[in-house]
């Protein structure tokens, strides 16, 4: 049975009197740091010089190189991209850890797959908001929150659980509810969701639909509208009320087509392929491939990215979005 923790369930403020170093000031970093600061905690930022360093200064934080921030802190929350956490930990965090420090993460990748192996005398915990940083911050300011996960990997001090829950409350997460998990469960489910459904699955489904229509002689512009542009309408309905809300909101024609044609596209073979993806995540094949490619300068990653950038659906989409000024441009600068 899933247990959800709320504000009233956090009986002890285990962060009281402790200094918190937030390492990184990107999407999650700025939200965690500002929420904690607004709740009265002593927060410093650890980051390398650059735009984020300057932004943290502008936002009123004491900002230090990572090693200096860690030296001062009792709790260290690492909010850096997965691929750079290992080097930053080895060179700047690990040498400055002290007994009974608490080392925290918002995603379990590097702990679960052994890239980062903390000493046995420090606490290791996870607090993972289920939403992007700007939403974590905005909902906090509005008086609500984004639901989050928390988990304990090591409890050297005997207080890791209290510290993790206090941290979750500090960023506002217990207003909405915090679900207990493990580093293993959070990591494997997160990667599976990204690869099989949210990113890999959806993007390939859209591409295949686009190609099917274009190859059948339909105009690429119409294909784009039908399989990509209108996706937002469906996702918004699903986000607000699940698949039942989608089916309630669409036409009877669309709903009937959902029932009779959906299983023809997503066949039992697709589920078997999903199981294979999950197996590659569980046994470390995916993480090893990602880690090795990172060591080799992301040659495979950048090659795959460039191939996808050149797909016809991307070219058509860029042209059509010029016709829609009501869409706030989020195009990536090259």
Curated annotation (Swiss-Prot):
Residues 1-181 form the KARI N-terminal Rossmann domain. Its EC number is 1.1.1.86. The active site is at residue 107. SUPFAM superfamilies: 6-phosphogluconate dehydrogenase C-terminal domain-like, NAD(P)-binding Rossmann-fold domains. NADP(+) binds at residues 25-28, 48, 52, 82-85, 133. The keyword Transport does not apply. One of its GO terms (molecular function) is magnesium ion binding. GO terms for cellular component: cytosol. Its cofactor is Mg(2+). Involved in the biosynthesis of branched-chain amino acids (BCAA). Catalyzes an alkyl-migration followed by a ketol-acid reduction of (S)-2-acetolactate (S2AL) to yield (R)-2,3-dihydroxy-isovalerate. In the isomerase reaction, S2AL is rearranged via a Mg-dependent methyl migration to produce 3-hydroxy-3-methyl-2-ketobutyrate (HMKB). In the reductase reaction, this 2-ketoacid undergoes a metal-dependent reduction by NADPH to yield (R)-2,3-dihydroxy-isovalerate. This is Ketol-acid reductoisomerase (NADP(+)). It comes from Staphylococcus aureus (strain MSSA476).
């Amino acid at each position: 049975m899933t247990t959800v923790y709320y504000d009233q369930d956090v009986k002890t403020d285990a962060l009281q009197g402790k200094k918190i170093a937030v390492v990184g000031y990107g999407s999650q970093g700025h939200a965690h740091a500002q929420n904690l600061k607004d709740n009265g905690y002593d927060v410093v930022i650890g980051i390398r010089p650059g735009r984020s360093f300057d932004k943290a200064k502008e936002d009123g934080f004491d900002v230090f190189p990572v090693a200096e921030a860690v030296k001062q802190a009792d709790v260290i929350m690492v909010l850096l991209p997965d691929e750079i956490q290992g080097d930053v930990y080895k060179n700047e965090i690990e040498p400055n850890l002290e007994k009974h420090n608490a080392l925290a993460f918002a995603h379990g990748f590097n702990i679960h797959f052994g890239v980062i192996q903390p000493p046995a005398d420090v606490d290791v915990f996870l607090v993972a908001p289920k939403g992007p940083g700007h939403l974590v911050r905005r909902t906090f300011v509005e008086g609500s929150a984004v639901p989050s996960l928390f988990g304990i990997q090591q409890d050297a001090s005997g207080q890791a659980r209290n510290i993790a829950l206090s941290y979750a409350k500090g960023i506002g997460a217990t207003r909405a509810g915090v679900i207990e998990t493990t580093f293993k469960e959070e990591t494997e489910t997160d990667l599976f969701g990204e690869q099989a459904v949210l990113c890999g699955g959806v993007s390939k489904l859209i591409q295949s639909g686009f190609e099917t229509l274009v190859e059948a002689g339909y105009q690429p512009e119409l294909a784009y509208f039908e399989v990509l542009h209108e996706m937002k309408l469906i996702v918004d309905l699903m986000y607000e009320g699940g698949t039942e809300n989608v089916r309630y909101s669409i036409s009877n024609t669309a709903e009937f087509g959902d029932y009779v044609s959906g299983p023809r596209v997503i066949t039992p073979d697709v589920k078997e392929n999903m199981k294979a993806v999950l197996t590659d995540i569980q046994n470390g094949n995916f993480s090893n491939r990602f880690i090795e490619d990172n060591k080799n300068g992301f040659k495979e990653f950048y090659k795959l990215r460039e191939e996808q950038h050149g797909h016809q659906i991307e070219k058509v989409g860029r042209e059509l979005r010029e016709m829609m000024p009501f869409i706030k441009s989020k195009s990536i600068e090259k």
